[in-house]
């Protein structure tokens, strides 16, 4: 029976008391949730905790009174399974359904609206009956932009509400799959942010930071959150590959948050992290280095309790971090971000040689030649012996000359075409066969003929 057939069958038919029947699917086996399958679904998969599910439903009281129906609204109802967005009976029952399945669910009050009811349609302590049809379900998108790059499906819910933060020590068991081929199977203990050194994709670390202790989840990673356009030769993963991971977060120890650290701790940790970032940078692990330098900025940027001596140390670390961030962004070809990091560095030291030079490089990379030239000229004004700036300024000048030459040629061709068209039009007018001239002659003949006709008729 389809959703439309359900609606047709229900119209006026549910007037007699409804029977209590079905298989007990309540966790306590207390007959709190009874289920009868009216039409089998397809496939073998059922929704998991956190999945977005899409259903049509109709609800009745036990006396047959209908109190709600998504069919009447002609709009499917959706919710996140297992998140407490609906009554308990629904979270329990829909988790057992397959796509296309139609079932009847009978819910005791403690699995529905309890002693409070849901006025005015549902009285206190009401047993409810629903018919539910499952159309679709999909995993939870964990990306900031909701671009579908990291999809999570929770096999087993974790405990509590705490989650690993950046720098937390996590203990995980994982399996990585590429097209059903198991390519990675390990138990690891590592610091969040260090995953790249263990050949873990960035999307996996990002997902781990959304997990709870004891959680077992399936993760689907798009290429930009997996091994990207480089692939991973060690695992025989080609470029632009989509991956699947099964991850069990066994335990974790949270790192101290910024607000939990003293000013002295922040400076000590920043110095350690700076060295770690430098090691990653030298190894060509620019994303890893980026994470380290970002930590320093987050710890020090808004700290107001430093002593006068600590302020100088903090400023030096912040300046170095912004400059190093700019260098990482340049290596990763994130040129706008590189400019932003240079600007932050130049706010701390307006004549900083590296800040001006790296900003010039970022401008040059995106063909902002005038801005790049200004930065390189400023470097040479302040530091005349900077050979790299001289070389880059020469590149700028050369590209600006080429750009001017291209524009001159473009405009010359444009003006030449316009002149040719103008001369051609003049020649056609002189010959009397210009389209506009012909049209005007036709119009004059039409007008003359009309006038003659009017005069004759008059």
UniProtKB/Swiss-Prot annotation:
Residues with the N-acetylthreonine modification: 2
Post-translational modification summary for this protein: Phosphorylation by CK2 results in loss of HSP90 binding activity.
Modified residue Omega-N-methylarginine is at which positions?
Answer: 373
What Gene Ontology terms describe what this protein does at the molecular function level? peptidyl-prolyl cis-trans isomerase activity; tau protein binding
Cross-link position per record: Glycyl lysine isopeptide (Lys-Gly) (interchain with G-Cter in SUMO1): 441
Q: What class of enzyme is it?
A: isomerase
The PPIase FKBP-type domain covers 50-138, 167-253
Q: What is reported on the regulation of this protein's activity?
A: Inhibited by FK506.
Instruction: Using the UniProt annotation, give all residue ranges assigned to the region (Interaction with tubulin).
Output: 267-400
Catalytic reaction list:
[protein]-peptidylproline (omega=180) = [protein]-peptidylproline (omega=0)
Which parts of this chain are annotated as the region Disordered?
Answer: 1-24, 423-458
Spans of biased composition, class Polar residues? 448-458
Could you list this entry's UniProt keywords, alphabetically sorted.
Answer: Acetylation, Chaperone, Cytoplasm, Cytoskeleton, Isomerase, Isopeptide bond, Methylation, Microtubule, Mitochondrion, Nucleus, Phosphoprotein, Repeat, Rotamase, TPR repeat, Ubl conjugation
**PROSITE patterns noted in UniProt:** FKBP_PPIASE, TPR, TPR_REGION
Per the record, residues carrying Phosphotyrosine are 220
Question: Where is the PTM Phosphoserine found along the chain?
Answer: 450, 452
Phosphothreonine modification sites are 143
**What Gene Ontology cellular-component terms does the record carry?**
axonal growth cone; cytosol; microtubule; mitochondrion; nucleus
A Pfam family per the record:
FKBP_C
In terms of InterPro entries, this protein maps to: FKBP4/5/8-like, PPIase_dom_sf, PPIase_FKBP_dom, TPR-like_helical_dom_sf, TPR_2, TPR_rpt
For bias type Basic and acidic residues, the affected ranges are: 434-446
Task: Indicate where this protein resides in the cell.
Answer: Cytoplasm, Cytosol; Mitochondrion; Nucleus; Cytoplasm, Cytoskeleton
What is its biological role?
A: Immunophilin protein with PPIase and co-chaperone activities. Component of steroid receptors heterocomplexes through interaction with heat-shock protein 90 (HSP90). May play a role in the intracellular trafficking of heterooligomeric forms of steroid hormone receptors between cytoplasm and nuclear compartments. The isomerase activity controls neuronal growth cones via regulation of TRPC1 channel opening. Also acts as a regulator of microtubule dynamics by inhibiting MAPT/TAU ability to promote microtubule assembly. May have a protective role against oxidative stress in mitochondria.
Q: What is this protein called?
A: Peptidyl-prolyl cis-trans isomerase FKBP4
Recorded source organism is: Oryctolagus cuniculus (Rabbit)
């Amino acid at each position: 029976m389809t959703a439309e057939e359900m609606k047709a069958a229900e119209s006026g038919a549910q007037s007699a008391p409804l029977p209590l029947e079905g298989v007990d699917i309540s966790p306590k086996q207390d007959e709190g949730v009874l289920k009868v399958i009216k039409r089998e679904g397809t496939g073998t998969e059922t929704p998991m905790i956190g999945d977005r599910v899409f259903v049509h439903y109709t609800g009745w009281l036990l006396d047959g009174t209908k109190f709600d129906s998504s069919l009447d609204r002609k709009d499917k109802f959706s919710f996140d399974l297992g998140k407490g967005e609906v009554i308990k009976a629904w979270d329990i029952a829909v988790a057992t359904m397959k796509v296309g399945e139609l079932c009847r669910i009978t819910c005791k009050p403690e699995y529905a609206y309890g002693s409070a009811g849901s006025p005015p349609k549902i009285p206190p302590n009401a047993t409810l009956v629903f018919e539910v049809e499952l159309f679709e379900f999909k995993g939870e998108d964990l990306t900031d932009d909701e671009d579908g790059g990291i999809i999570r499906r929770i096999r087993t819910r974790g405990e509590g509400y705490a989650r690993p933060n950046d720098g937390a020590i996590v203990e995980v068991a994982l399996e990585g799959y590429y097209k059903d081929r198991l390519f990675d199977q390990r138990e690891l203990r590592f610091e969040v942010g260090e995953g790249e050194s263990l050949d873990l994709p960035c999307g996996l670390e990002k997902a781990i930071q959304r997990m709870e202790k004891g959680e077992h989840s399936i993760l689907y990673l798009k290429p930009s959150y997996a091994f990207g356009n480089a692939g991973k030769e060690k695992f025989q993963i080609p470029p632009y590959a989509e991956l699947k991971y099964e991850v069990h977060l066994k335990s974790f120890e949270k790192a101290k948050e910024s607000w939990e650290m003293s000013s002295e701790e922040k400076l000590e940790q920043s110095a350690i992290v700076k060295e770690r970032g430098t090691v990653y940078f030298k190894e060509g692990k620019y994303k890893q280095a980026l994470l380290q330098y970002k930590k320093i900025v987050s710890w020090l940027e808004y700290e107001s309790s430093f002593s006068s001596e600590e302020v100088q140390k903090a400023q030096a670390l912040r300046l170095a971090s912004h400059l190093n961030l700019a260098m990482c962004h340049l290596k990763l070809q994130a040129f706008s971000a590189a400019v932003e990091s240079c600007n932050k560095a130049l706010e701390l030291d307006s004549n900083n040689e590296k800040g001006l030079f790296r900003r010039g490089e970022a401008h040059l990379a995106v063909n902002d030649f005038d801005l790049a030239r200004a930065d390189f000229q400023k470097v040479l004004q302040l530091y005349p012996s900077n050979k790299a700036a001289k070389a880059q300024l020469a590149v700028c000048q050369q590209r600006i000359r080429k750009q001017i030459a291209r524009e001159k040629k473009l405009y010359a061709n444009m003006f030449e075409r316009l002149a040719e068209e103008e001369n051609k039009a003049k020649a056609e007018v002189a010959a009397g066969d210009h389209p506009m001239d012909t049209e005007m002659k036709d119009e004059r003949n039409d007008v003359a003929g009309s006038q003659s006709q009017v005069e004759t008729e008059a």
